Amino acid sequence: MAYVTIDDSEHLEKALKRFKRQVEKEGIIREWKKKEFYEKPSTVLNRKNKALRRKLMKKTRRSRDSKSY
């Protein structure tokens, strides 16, 4: 959980910026957006498989390009 301690001499805007940065770093908003709507288990599986195939294709392309002839 993200939290920020504020000093008496610190401006509120600066503390809000620090809080926003910390929330983005922890991925809280991204996780919330993922869980905002229900997603069927089959859809989740299809999305993960698609990402895995994309990752493998990228890896094979890189290995093919890096070969020296």
UniProtKB/Swiss-Prot annotation:
Keywords of this entry: Ribonucleoprotein, Ribosomal protein
Record GO biological process: translation
GO cellular component, one term: ribonucleoprotein complex
Pfam families given in the database record: Ribosomal_S21 (PF01165)
GO molecular function: structural constituent of ribosome
SS bonds (residue pairs): none
Homology family: Belongs to the bacterial ribosomal protein bS21 family.
Full protein name: Small ribosomal subunit protein bS21
Organism per entry: Treponema denticola (strain ATCC 35405 / DSM 14222 / CIP 103919 / JCM 8153 / KCTC 15104)
Biological classification of the source: Bacteria, Pseudomonadati, Spirochaetota, Spirochaetia, Spirochaetales
